Amino acid sequence: MLRLASLKFGRLFRYAKVLFAASLLVVMLLNTHSLLSSFQRNELTDRRFLSLNKCPACFGTSWCRKFMNGQLSFEGWGRLRLLDFFNVKNVHFAQYGEPREGSRRVVLKRLGSNHELSELDQRICKKATGRPRCDLVQAMYKTDFARLNGDVRLLTPDVVEGWSDLVHCPSQRLLDRLVRRYAETKDSGSFLLRNLKDTERMQLLLTLAFNPEPLVLQSFPSDEGWPFAKYLGACGRMVAVNYVGEELWSYFNAPWEKRVDLAWQLMEIAEQLTNNDFDFALYLLDVSFDNFAVGPRDGKVIIVDAENVLVADKKLIKQNKPENWDVWYESKFDDCDKEACLSFSKEILCSRATVDHNYYAICQNLLSRHATWRGTSGGLLHDPPAEIAKDGRLEALLDECANPKKRYGRFKSAKELREYLAQLSNNAR
């Protein structure tokens, strides 16, 4: 009986797929004219498509000239707006061309789904007018995004604390860094807010509240060795970042030597974001195989989704000395039945000088046998060679890093794991 039900379900699933494909074909045939025009027209030069008409309720304008000049165009099937229905994250691939440099691939992001962007518009309107629809441009001047006028000297923690993960517990030092490195102004380099235009201040604050990823990329740039994708610019509600390469997930079944190297890099990223010369701890609150990519030439691992990064100023923690500030904090292992689970307390991340969160996140969600993603298990270091499996050291270190049995076991095992992976990687070369 069970087998019969399974067969029936299988047939129904196949029929559903066929019906879906047929429906899609019909829709495409009915929209042949619009499909052809989509291929012929470069919508990245359209102000309304870019939501440039909504500025300053947007993310910036630094790249608008490049968009309007036709220097950016969607790749292949990405030109079909019909397929946007399936692109929930609103992430697109495009070609960007410079006259003397040729073209290269870039990634375009709207920083949210259509639903999230629509909700943003409604919140702005309700705040300003009490109604869900309004003139966004006028409404922006009646919101918290416009509360900082030209007389305000600094962006201070009391204004933006808790707006997003980036500023869950902001220090003045962090906010000065965000303003000084803000790329959507011609006069960047100063931490004084009054050097920004009114519209630029509003765009900065809106980005900080809606999705601070651009500000993370600008404040901790790849040019200075931070493991994030390079920020290029914005036009309206379309942000351009450098294309890194295939996502980490595509290397899940790569040769063992390659996976060992990637695992070592991931642990190095965890270390860099936790302990660095700037005394900022950047904690990754969303860690999955989709949030990292690998460069095709240099094989370098880069973070490509930085929306959920909490920055704690360890210099301020050491200065203010909140309760238990110097007690090492061990993150709690989360044995949940969902993908990419993490257990953390933002308040503790903000108040302890020594935290193992990044090691925990990388080990549990990417490297160890506890990592699950898209129906797979075993993590990036699954199925090691027989001699390594027999030795047992790798499995023991991964287990202790993900789910420590000893006090402060994760701190010790993370350090040993980095060293062991470096050794394995060197031996494989």
Curated annotation (Swiss-Prot):
Q: Where in the cell is it found?
A: Cytoplasmic vesicle, COPI-coated vesicle; Golgi apparatus; Secreted
Primary localization: cytoplasm
**Signal sequence annotation:** 1-34
Please list the GO biological process terms of this entry.
cardiac muscle cell proliferation; regulation of phosphatidylinositol 3-kinase/protein kinase B signal transduction
User: Which InterPro entries does this UniProt record tie to the protein?
Assistant: DIPK2A/B (IPR020519), FAM69_kinase_dom (IPR022049)
Question: Keyword set for this entry?
Answer: Cytoplasmic vesicle, Golgi apparatus, Secreted, Signal
Protein origin, superkingdom: Eukaryota
Q: Does the keyword Cell membrane apply?
A: no
What GO terms fall under cellular component here?
COPI-coated vesicle; extracellular space; Golgi apparatus
Q: What's one Pfam family here?
A: PIP49_C
Q: What does this protein do?
A: May play a role in cardiomyocyte proliferation through paracrine signaling and activation of the PPI3K-AKT-CDK7 signaling cascade.
Q: Give the family from UniProt.
A: Belongs to the DIPK family.
Tell me the protein's name.
Answer: Divergent protein kinase domain 2A
Q: Which organism is it from?
A: Xenopus tropicalis (Western clawed frog)
